[in-house]
Every structure is written in structure tokens, then in C-alpha cells.
Amino acid sequence: MGTFCSVVKFENLQELKRLCHWGPIIALGVIAICSAMAMIDSVLWYWPLHTTGGSVNFIMLINWTVMILYNYFNAMFVGPGFVPLGWKPENSQDSVYLQYCKVCQAYKAPRSHHCRKCNRCVMKMDHHCPWINNCCGYQNHASFTLFLLLAPLGCIHAAFIFVMTMYTQLYNRLSFGWNTVKIDMSAARRDPLPIIPFGLAAFAATLFALGLALGTTIAVGMLFFIQMKIILRNKTSIESWIEEKAKDRIQYYQLDEVFVFPYDMGSRWKNFKQVFTWSGVPEGDGLDWPIREGCHQYSLTIEQLKQKADKRVRSVRYKVIEDYSGTCCPLNRGIKTFFTSPCTEEPRIRLQKGEFILATRGLRYWLYGDKILDDSVLEGVSRIRGWFPRNCVEKCPCDAETDQAPEGEKKNR
């Protein structure tokens, strides 16, 4: 626990505001309900503390809760690690291999990406997780993955307690008739009688907690296997997408080149050790990374620059012909536009008649692009980009001649 205490200090207490979000509220609520009900069921109705097995079981339940909460808060409050504001590579000549972030006023270090929610460039960013209200990245990847492992294991233990409690409490209350089965919930037929009878309210609460435990085991368990796949390959979700686009770019232009992902060390054990260490602190500093033979530190960033240049070539300029409020599912834009709204966390952008948009990808009834801002407004302002209805814009005449479809548009028609 030394890592947690050394990073989360008094001056970082402003991070407590991360708890004021629907994700942590739901996550902590599920943990509290499952833990509390498992302990109550064990002590009162299933495995009393005066028995050896009951004591061991109770200690294990407390242990699960402590370890789950420790790794959860570690992932939330320690965070992924952010690229320092104004960061530049040690060798100024290397800046040509890096993208520049206008919001952070810094170059994007290898493997880092800008998060719109955190409003910072994140080291080795995998994704922004709403359940911890923070990004998963370089510093908290191990804690986040351990939380994904411990939560299902603890829920499996709790689910066992719930099932056995309901079974033992209901078994002697069942009465079978010729055509009916009745359950007497008035009192327990057990000697000695429990301090609090297992009534209808207790049964409903236990059944509800069982549903939460089983749902958490399945959902969070799947996320754990996804994260382990990422760790063993040393390739984040974003980097997998970059690699896929690299192959598409090479195939589209029929180039005589091969993209090799530079951070997979060729050994799952070596990849694993970069995230999980005995000290609890991941290897490296989050800015410079070990690379495989035949690659160099900027192999991935150079590919990103190529993809960015290719996206600019493929982008299409549109003019806004009708205002759009930026709502997720606009009813006034037509029934098809309403029902085909993109299912993504990416934002919608407000449009005003006369503005210009540079579209980079699209669906049949929606487009995604950047607003073209004036030079007087552009400096110091982050890019305004997102989804908008296709029927709010028209293609500019100069781009209509090329008839170049935005990326992804043909595939989604």
C-alpha cells in the first residue's frame, strides 16, 4: 500500500471530486451492497461467527472488500500519469516525429494521447473508464487490472453465500401439496432460532444482491480478459486501432512497406513485467519505452503522422446549410437520422448556418469532422470536432468535383 500512500497526498485531495460521477457511485454502490449482504447473510443465517468456518469465511469477505476497494481507489486517484505540460523531447530534432497538442501546449510523447474528458495528454492511454472516472494508462494499469480480477472473485464468493443462505433458509420452509408448493416465511424452523428471522425482506435483498454479484462477475470478468490480452501483447486498444489503420493504409495505396508494432517485446512474460512489478510501480517513466529489435522510439508516432496526413487528403469540406443544436438524437432532422444516431461517447457539435466543416469519416445519415475556425479564434482553442447530421450540410463545390468520400462512409452505406 506504500505506492498508494506516497502518491495520494493531502494536496491531491481535490481528486475526491472524481467520486461525484455516476460511474463511481454505481460501482461503489454495487460493492457496498454485495459486501454488506454477504456479511449479514453469513453471520445471521448461514455461517455463524462462533464456528471456525464462519470466522474464516467472514475474514475472507472482509479481505475481498479491502483489496477490491484498495485497487479501485488506487486506479482512480493515482491515475494514468499525464505528459507534463509544455513537454518537449530532449533532442529538439526529434520533434518532427511527434504530434503537437495545442491544448496541453506540448508534444505528444510516444504512446500518449489526449483525453477529452481529462483534458490532458495521457501516458500510454488505453481508454477513459467511466467506472473510475479516470483514464486507464501507464501508472494505474496494474491497479485497474487487479480490480477487474478481484471484483469477480469476490462476487463469486458472495454469490455462493447468497445461494447457500437462501437454500438453507427455505429448505425447511417448503411444504408440498398435490398441486402446489408453499413457502412459510413467517419463522425459521431451526434450533436455535436466529436473532433476526429470515423474512420476505431479507429474501428479496439477498436475491437482489445475488443478481448484482452474478452480473458483475460476467461483465467485469470479460473486461479483465480484455485487459490481460492488452497487457500480454503490450498493445493498448488505441494502438491496436492504429495498427489496423496502418495495414489498411499500406494496402489501399499498395505500398512496399511493412508496419511492425515496436512495443511488443516478443515475450508475453516481458510484456507482463512492464505492468506488474514487485514494487507496484510500472517500469520506465511513461515517456521512453523499450522497443523490439528493428524498430526505434518513434516508429509508432511516425505511422500516426502518416495516417494524419492521409486523413487530411481524404477529408471533404462541407458548408453548414441548416442549424443543428448538438443534441444526441434530433427529432427535427428526420426519423432515419434519429434512429441511426452513432452509438459512441464521441460528442456531437453544434452547427450554425454558414460555418464550414472538414469531414473525415461518416455514416449514411451522419458525418464526423472538425469545425474550420478562423485564425483569430484558433490560437489556444482546442479542436471542435464531433458528429452532426448529414442533411445539415452540403459539399463545397471545390470538393464536390473530387467526389472523395469520407473515411468509413462507403463501408457503412
UniProtKB/Swiss-Prot annotation:
- Primary localization: endoplasmic reticulum
What does the UniProt entry say about where the protein is found?
A: Endoplasmic reticulum membrane
Q: Where are the membrane-spanning stretches?
A: 25-45, 58-78, 144-164, 195-215
Q: Which InterPro entries match?
A: Palmitoyltrfase_DHHC (IPR001594), PFA4/ZDH16/20/ERF2-like (IPR039859), SH3_domain (IPR001452)
Attached lipid, kind S-palmitoyl cysteine, located at: C328, C329, C343
Which GO CC annotations does the UniProt entry carry? endoplasmic reticulum; endoplasmic reticulum membrane; Golgi apparatus
What terms describe the molecular function in GO for this protein?
Answer: palmitoyltransferase activity; protein-cysteine S-palmitoyltransferase activity; protein-cysteine S-stearoyltransferase activity
Q: Determine the domain of life of the protein's source.
A: Eukaryota
Residues in the Cytoplasmic compartment per record: 1-24, 79-143, 216-413
Q: What reaction does this enzyme carry out catalytically?
A: L-cysteinyl-[protein] + hexadecanoyl-CoA = S-hexadecanoyl-L-cysteinyl-[protein] + CoA; L-cysteinyl-[protein] + octadecanoyl-CoA = S-octadecanoyl-L-cysteinyl-[protein] + CoA
Segments on the Lumenal face? 46-57, 165-194
Q: Where is the SH3 domain?
A: 313-398
Can the keyword Translocase be found in this entry's annotation?
A: no
Active site annotation, chain numbering: C129 (s-palmitoyl cysteine intermediate)
Question: What are the UniProt keywords, alphabetically?
Answer: Acyltransferase, Endoplasmic reticulum, Lipoprotein, Membrane, Palmitate, SH3 domain, Transferase, Transmembrane, Transmembrane helix
The answer to keyword Transmembrane helix applying to this record is yes
Per the Swiss-Prot or TrEMBL annotation, the motif Di-lysine motif is positioned at 410-413
Q: How is it modified after translation?
A: Palmitoylated at 3 different sites by ZDHHC16. The combination of the different palmitoylation events strongly affects the quaternary assembly of ZDHHC6, its localization, stability and function. Palmitoylation at Cys-328 accelerates the turnover of ZDHHC6. Depalmitoylated by LYPLA2.
This enzyme's EC code(s): 2.3.1.225, 2.3.1.-
What positions does the domain DHHC occupy? 99-149
For the biological process aspect of GO, one term held by this record is: protein stearoylation
Please state what the annotation says regarding this protein's domains: The DHHC domain is required for palmitoyltransferase activity.
Function of the molecule: Endoplasmic reticulum palmitoyl acyltransferase that mediates palmitoylation of proteins such as AMFR, CALX, ITPR1 and TFRC. Palmitoylates calnexin (CALX), which is required for its association with the ribosome-translocon complex and efficient folding of glycosylated proteins. Mediates palmitoylation of AMFR, promoting AMFR distribution to the peripheral endoplasmic reticulum. Together with SELENOK, palmitoylates ITPR1 in immune cells, leading to regulate ITPR1 stability and function.
Assembly description: Homooligomerizes. Interacts with SELENOK.
Q: Which family does it belong to?
A: Belongs to the DHHC palmitoyltransferase family.
Q: What is this protein called?
A: Palmitoyltransferase ZDHHC6
Q: What is the species of this protein?
A: Bos taurus
